[in-house]
Amino acid sequence: MSEQLPLLIELGTEELPVKALPGLAQAFFDGVLAGLEKRGVAVTRGDAKPLSTPRRLAVLLPGVATEQPEQRSEVLGPYLNIALDAEGKPTRALAGFAAKAGIDWTALERTSDAKGERFVHRAVTPGAQAAALLPEILREAIAAMPIPKPMRWGAHEYAFARPVQWLVLLFGDTVIPAELLGVRGDRITRGHRFMHDGDIALAAPGDYIDALRAAHVLVDADARRARIVEEVDAAARQAGGSARISDDNLEQVVNLVEWPSAVLCSFERAFLAVPQEALIETMEINQKFFPVLDDGGKLTEQFIGIANIVSKDVAEVAKGYERVIRPRFADAKFFFDEDLKQGLEAMGAGLASVTYQAKLGTVADKVARVAALAEAIAPQVGADPVQARRAAELAKNDLQSRMVNEFPELQGIAGRHYAKAAGEPSEISLAIDEAYQPRFAGDDIALSPLGKVLAIAERLDTLAGGFAAGLKPTGNKDPFALRRNALGLARTVIESGFDLDLPKLIDVGLASLPDAVKPHADRNTETVRADLYDFILDRLKGYYADKGVAATHFNAVAELKPASLYDFDRRIDAIGIFATLPEAEALAAANKRIRNILRKVEGEIPGDIDTTLLREPAEEALAEAVEAAIGDTGDALHRHDYVAVLARLARLRPQVDAFFDGVMVNADDPQLRANRLALLKKLGDRLGSVAAIEHLSS
């Protein structure tokens, strides 16, 4: 095994794109490792990970073999009776073999097999030096990096995410003599652009992280992240509050700075009259600042900026941040005040002139459909139908507001504030906001009953209209976000415990559509309903997979196509518990066998069991056990207590096993055969009453 040395590769660049930086760093790291692995160069990775700042991408590996392992080869040649003539001299066959091997035939070795003795050429090829392989490995890694818009600079033909300024190629204490992207490798790196003067000469790769830290650069993104969180939290505590640190904002800031330093800032209290969501969005999305909240989660007039420098005059830095945020807040306040003058109800007048979809009419048409759906759904879940209709009629009005035009992410949120200002009941104003939940993957569903009703009605109309208008998603195309709407609808129903009949709701949604897209003879309601139901189930498959539910369990329930998604969920829970029972596998296999037997039957199977035709003790015992189980589980099925149903059915295993071991189902006597089929049908129907448990059979 060859010696291993630490390896450092650093590409020093101009400021790299913030959003692309993590992906570039990971791709560079992965590409270098893949290139070494492809060439058989051993690597001790340890806890190595991608290293990066806005001005550099680096790979630091604790151990890389100095050379490839030697390559041993063996090439079989001709047998002796072909290789040598009668005088023991080489024939043309042997001479050709030796020439191809590049050696004299006398240097060839011999080996034997079942056919006799033959010549063989064995060779040992030394491995290439890793230092010689690394330039090509780096070129491959750079070429494979996901750079959406490569740049060219100077007179070079090279292209990269940003112009490359320096290159560190250090293997052990030796510089690899190579040129990449127009820059020659060296041991010289650079510190912070403003807080460190001069170059930094690295004696060895192991000096890299500490040398940069001394030069005010945290090259490890995790270290920058931890420092930012620590400093932001400390600044917020100093202000008497707590910082709002969203993951997205934090990741952006981590990739904007090399040496983060928190700066506490403030703005005029008058701006707090604006919905805090608008102010927070301005701070986070536009300026990458961290808002400070009070103990009740309300926005305060203070915020925290992250400087890429430790300033001697922090107050001046704070003034700069405050100067940047003030005009944006002033605009938001102007939009809000103007919207309040107009009023939420008046905003709705413009919806009739906004096209929702060519076949589905205007946004006003959609509002009318959603209002009717909400009014129909509300009584089924204990919500007020009058309030449901009112909330739905107002829910889209804020789309015409100045605030939402400037901050599209505030749709619904702005409507809540405007409804509250207009004196609408709190239930209605909250529902206007919650109608959009869940807004993204992993978001919470609506919490209030009215919000849940609106969320369901809105998504139901979107889905029904989309499918009726032929807008079903294909591949990556889903312009109306029907997949997201389907999952949002399903989650809201299931997680709210609403026992709604989904096919009936789909029918109501289809019936309210414009005549141009209503189901017709060629594509009737039943077809559209079935397509949409299956589409929603397909979204549920991923939902349950994310929760750790086995695909076999999902398929077992999906085969029954329960009308209620909440009922679907209860069956999923029950089948998960049933699968842990010792009887589960045997009963699943038995039900699979029953299905296969019944599938081959021609003609009608009797509905009842004739006890006078039960001849074998095992079939008598099974018939008695099945009737008892049916009696015991009827009430539990009615109550949807599927766990109890399956637990009771599990007790049938001894009788089921005995039946299949000792009874011939396809008896010669047609009456006996029909009676046994009737028994199996009764058994199979009850075993499959909660889920098609045969899916559990391996």
UniProtKB/Swiss-Prot annotation:
Transmembrane segments: none annotated. It comes from the Bacteria. Its main location: cytoplasm. Coiled coil: none annotated. InterPro entries: DALR_anticod-bd, Gly-tRNA-synth_bsu, Gly-tRNA-synth_heterodimer. It catalyses: tRNA(Gly) + glycine + ATP = glycyl-tRNA(Gly) + AMP + diphosphate. One of its GO terms (cellular component) is cytosol. One of its GO terms (biological process) is glycyl-tRNA aminoacylation. GO terms for molecular function: arginine-tRNA ligase activity; ATP binding; glycine-tRNA ligase activity. It is found in: Cytoplasm. Its EC number is 6.1.1.14. Keywords: Aminoacyl-tRNA synthetase, ATP-binding, Cytoplasm, Ligase, Nucleotide-binding, Protein biosynthesis. It is an enzyme of class 6 (ligase). PANTHER family: GLYCINE--TRNA LIGASE, CHLOROPLASTIC_MITOCHONDRIAL 2, GLYCYL-TRNA SYNTHETASE. Belongs to the class-II aminoacyl-tRNA synthetase family. Tetramer of two alpha and two beta subunits. This is Glycine--tRNA ligase beta subunit.
